[in-house]
Amino acid sequence: MNLNLIFKEQTLKFNKEEQETYLFLQQHNSDWANIFKEMILQGRDKVTQRLVTSMHRENLVKARTQSKKILSRDLIMLDISTTHILEIQFPQAKQTLYAPITGEHAFDRIDVEGPFYIKDDITNTITRVHHPNEILECILIEAPDLKNAASDQFQQDLINSATNMTFAISYQALSMQHDSAPLFNIIENSEDSYLRSEQAVIEGHPLHPGAKLRKGLNALQTFLYSSEFNQPIKLKIVLIHSKLSRTMSLSKDYDTTVHQLFPDLIKQLENEFTPKFNFNDYHIMIVHPWQLDDVLHSDYQAEVDKELIIEAKHTLDYYAGLSFRTLVPKYPAMSPHIKLSTNVHITGEIRTLSEQTTHNGPLMTRILNDILEKDVIFKSYASTIIDEVAGIHFYNEQDEADYQTERSEQLGTLFRKNIYQMIPQEVTPLIPSSLVATYPFNNESPIVTLIKRYQSAASLSDFESSAKSWVETYSKALLGLVIPLVTKYGIALEAHLQNAIATFRKDGLLDTMYIRDFEGLRIDKAQLNEMVYSTSHFHEKSRILTDSKTSVFNKAFYSTVQNHLGELILTISKASNDSNLERHMWYIVRDVLDNIFDQLVLSTHKSNQVNENRINEIKDTMFAPFIDYKCVTTMRLEDEAHHYTYIKVNNPLYRENN
């Protein structure tokens, strides 16, 4: 192959966002600034990797049908260490992309890694891809109808995400340079293992090109408020007049609940505001400091001037979780986890807090707890939910409709039970997203460490058999909660890696699975009503209620099977030389699912027995040869954040002669 290689490393330039971050780091820490500069291409490549993987699987601009695998020896002049390369044709752009393949996995996923190369098909020259936007340019030439406001925004998103990816991985390289132990050991030995696990997920979503999106924040704010930088955050407390708010709580009224959650704080606030105000006329709301500085004093100044919203001088010391807007105290503090509104663009959406979230959270908790208590099928599984105990949002009935919704969503608080109130001392809690994480000085992910521990504790002969037993225990707990809920009650929990907390025993096995965050779940309204649970008291703007059985199924399957179990199984398989291990682990998941469905059929509780036809319909869809896959990149380019786009992919749960 006669190619004239052109390498551009010598002319690598910062874009504006990278330059601003670099200047911030030069002022903050010159060593960090140097590492940031050295890792620019690595950070960009991690976002390019997500873009290429998703466009191929989604067949965006025929990236899958116009691709093929080639041997790396066919391009011996390139710096590629893998055996195979993914070649993707862009015929309209007259360019060809080369992406080194690191693995092929379930649901038609091909994993790639940088460096990536683009060949100009006219001049026959190859250049190294320096930024994911070079790939986006090819996409838009292939599909000019996608060149619009959404793609313009996506272009800026990729710049922001790549900058923050480098920001994050360079901090990890700096802060952990003296560490060498497996990441799980570091998490386990931390004062607060759960919080440390949230902070360990440096790269964000494993598949989303906007994994590190933080639009709306400058470098200093990103450093202060993002989980990976481990900074304490002083949450602001405001009093909001009862006539300008709506509240909901799980058992006792909102004020009583908050008083029980923060007894010392209430005394401090009473001393601060009495006798200036009638404390009983106000509700307590927690506000993110960025939201207070950026939004409160601009959009709510009239209410502040009238003392209908009052800022307290007291603050709460919290830390950001992986999701940015969910914050937690550091152990041994037992105050609640708090989900807040933030007008920051993260992973494709502005993360305000909808009215339905603060209203429906406690209501959903009440329904789920009632189901879990009364339906014996759940007694067999080591899984439960984390209560959302109270919520509040701003509400001015005098505001016009759209303006009213906007202002309500910008000022809201949801309180969630602290995980340490739910678990025994001898287990280690962590967010499952961290199970697949690594760091530069030890590439053993926590899930591999846990399996090795189990192998040793159980005196098993090899890693592969240990992995199969580990996956069986884990998937039984996860699916034993999700599948009966969606099948019997039409409730599809969004149980992806980020929406769970898992606790592990000393022998490495899962102890209990806890599912949290009910904002993104979906409910088959008719099915839940048929099971004698009313939805009439849900928020009038509820997006979680639907008549679409497909929407409900896809929500449960994508989050739980494709994302949650899919990432874990993929990571385990990469740690083994057995090319059949991934397939065999999916067989185990299929067996676990078969057993759960059998238990559903055998249920003797006539009062809440599900129709067997419904069970068979769900089984037929779940075990079909092809299954829907959510197209995250296509949705961003089509500006369809709330209307999901799917493509059919091969289903690893399918067996001939089902």
From Swiss-Prot:
A Gene Ontology BP annotation from the UniProt entry: siderophore biosynthetic process
Superkingdom: Bacteria
Keywords: ATP-binding, Ligase, Nucleotide-binding
Enzyme type, top EC level: ligase
Pathway listed: Siderophore biosynthesis
Entry-linked InterPro entries: Aerobactin_biosyn_IucA/IucC_N (IPR007310), IucA/IucC-like_C (IPR022770), LucA/IucC-like (IPR037455)
Pfam families to which the protein is assigned, alphabetical: FhuF, IucA_IucC
Role according to the record: Involved in the biosynthesis of the siderophore staphyloferrin A. Catalyzes the ATP-dependent condensation of D-ornithine and citrate to form a citryl-D-ornithine intermediate.
UniProt family annotation: Belongs to the IucA/IucC family.
Protein name (Swiss-Prot/TrEMBL): D-ornithine--citrate ligase
Species, as recorded: Staphylococcus aureus (strain NCTC 8325 / PS 47)
